[in-house]
UniProtKB/Swiss-Prot annotation:
NCBIfam families, sorted: recf (TIGR00611)
Biological role stated in the UniProt entry: The RecF protein is involved in DNA metabolism; it is required for DNA replication and normal SOS inducibility. RecF binds preferentially to single-stranded, linear DNA. It also seems to bind ATP.
Amino acids binding ATP: G30, K31, N32, G33, S34, G35, K36, T37
One Gene Ontology term, aspect cellular component: cytoplasm
Protein's recorded name: DNA replication and repair protein RecF
Taxonomic placement: Bacteria, Pseudomonadati, Pseudomonadota, Gammaproteobacteria, Thiotrichales
Name of the encoding gene: recF
Amino acid sequence: MYISNLRLQNFRNIPAKSFDFKNSINFIVGKNGSGKTSILESIYFLSHSRSFRSSQLNRIINHNADEFIIYTKAYNPDEITISLSRKKNSNNISKLNLEIQKNHTEITRNLPIQLINPESFNIINSGAQQRCKVIDWGAFYLDKTFLKIWQQTKFLVKQRNSALKQNYPYSYILSIDKKLCEFAEILDYKRQAYFTKLKPKIYEILSHFNPNLQLDIDYFRGWNLHKSLAQVLEESFNYDNKYKVTNHGPHKADIVLSVSHKPIQDIFSRGQQKLLICALKLAQGEIHNSENDNKCIYLIDDITSELDSIHTLTLFNYLKQLKSQVFITTTEKNKINEFIDTNSYILEI
């Protein structure tokens, strides 16, 4: 997948603009407030039907307008068009090849995105749910049945929590547990299948950033590895019932990062943590591209302020190997001069 043209109308501070891009590394250069990050945000919005900058979607609409529109022409390898519009206090309207979509799933499948921005580096210190999203992203693209299993599992956990809060009889909880265990086992299998591919790739790429970094990367499924979920739920029922929430299950899955059994945030410097996240993002893209004809697109916001020049160069070289389309923002052109080659495209705004 690559985007050849992007048109924005009333998206943040961009009233109406059309941009052409190359299927290579695209540098977006401009001062703070010029709209660089808004371009990345609009592409991300097209893929995910949400923003990575704000949950207040009305604020994304230009203050002089009542609606924003995002439109793109892309190739996969055939030409496709994707558009998304939103009016104030209304829902998103998504179109794929001019056809309105009931949900955004097909567009997300057509437009795989990896985002690297300053907030990406917080994943190590975030909760398990955020780290598990790394696995779920990859499993979604690796296995077309994953989404339905994930949705059903999420529904059953929510249903169980609701039953606990409303003091439903234990027999009713058991009926939910039976279904939950069935879907949880399938979900765990699919997550494990993706993690098995991801783990060695992270180690491989991280060694190019810093061969001296040693760490352990493990997948925790959300309950005791040596017990069935049914057994764990039965044993923990009194505790769950006391606090009115399900404390074990696939919703508690996590990627555990450690060094000699100590949390990585207690061992790695902030700079080393950034290298790990870059390796993680590159590993996801490489696995995706090897399993799909539809290559992943990278959105990278102001990376030169996050990494030194040596590690930034390593990141760029890996991105070139992936042959993915890349969008990179920067405030100063001189910061990227050493990374520009004949295939690069520079957009100054």
